[in-house]
A protein has these predicted regions:
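Catalytic-core segments of class I nucleotidyltransferases/pyrophosphorylases
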Residues: 122
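Core alpha/beta nucleotide-donor-binding catalytic domains of modification enzymes
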Residues: 1-112
């Protein structure tokens, strides 16, 4: 039993179970019950983790992990309204006891947001800020796609990806996301590798003439000005 990050680990396990069922029954779409309060909580949690732009706005109405489409149709709805509907329309509502346990970071964040609201936090303006960040994120995604299209070459059997030297001449965030996507694709993983590990690899690739490391089920190797990402056997 884990002693740290219990809710985060539990969430990851839930997704893994969902994905396995989806694979079994060939399901490509998953509807999730995240609401507006989850959106705000996720933003603050990501700030505490030191997340970048993509992490801050990671909870969206449509996300894709591998070949699975995650849809959140209730993301504009307030939690209090959904609870009201559950109790008064469906006559069915279950309270999760961990929602009141302040040893969990999410519950502490929930209390912080409530306090900020009492001190004048305007949720409409907060939501506008998140939406503005989403527009900025789309711009970065465009340049990531361009970097992957123009500066990577994949082998015939899709087991190796070759990155040219121009790949690493882009702005850092573009390099970071491009490399993260490359490792996830070749390693055939649902989730990207941890940011700190990718940062470390980028630093070595930029400074070293030759370099070899493993991450996310991949071997990352630099030979002169070329980087080769291949799947671990």
């Amino acid at each position: 039993k884990p002693s740290k990050n219990v809710q985060s680990i539990a969430r990851k396990k839930r997704y893994e179970l969902l994905f396995r069922k989806c694979d079994k029954y060939k399901i490509k779409y998953i509807l999730l019950g995240h609401h507006q309060d989850d959106l705000f909580e996720n933003f603050f949690i990501r700030i505490l983790r030191g997340s970048g732009l993509k992490g801050l706005i990671s909870l969206d109405k449509k996300n894709k992990i591998g070949d699975k489409n995650l849809l959140r149709p209730l993301l504009d709805e307030k939690k209090e309204n959904l609870i009201f509907i559950s109790k008064n329309v469906f006559n069915f509502y279950i309270e999760d006891p961990t929602n009141k346990d302040e040893k969990y970071k999410r519950i502490m964040i929930r209390g912080l947001i409530k306090k900020l609201q009492e001190d004048g936090l305007d949720k409409k303006k907060f939501l506008k800020t998140i939406n503005n960040l989403k527009f900025s994120n789309k711009v970065v995604d465009y340049y990531v796609d361009e970097n992957l299209k123009k500066n990577t070459f994949i082998s015939n059997n899709n087991s190796r990806l070759i990155l040219n030297n121009i790949f690493f001449l882009q702005p850092y965030e573009v390099i970071f996301r491009s490399l993260s996507e490359s490792i996830k694709m070749i390693g055939k993983k649902y989730y990207a590798a941890r940011g700190k590990k990718i940062d470390k690899i980028i630093n070595h690739l930029k400074k070293s003439v030759s370099y070899r490391s493993t991450l996310g089920g991949c071997i990352i190797e630099k030979v002169n000005e070329t980087v080769i990402i291949s799947r671990e056997q």
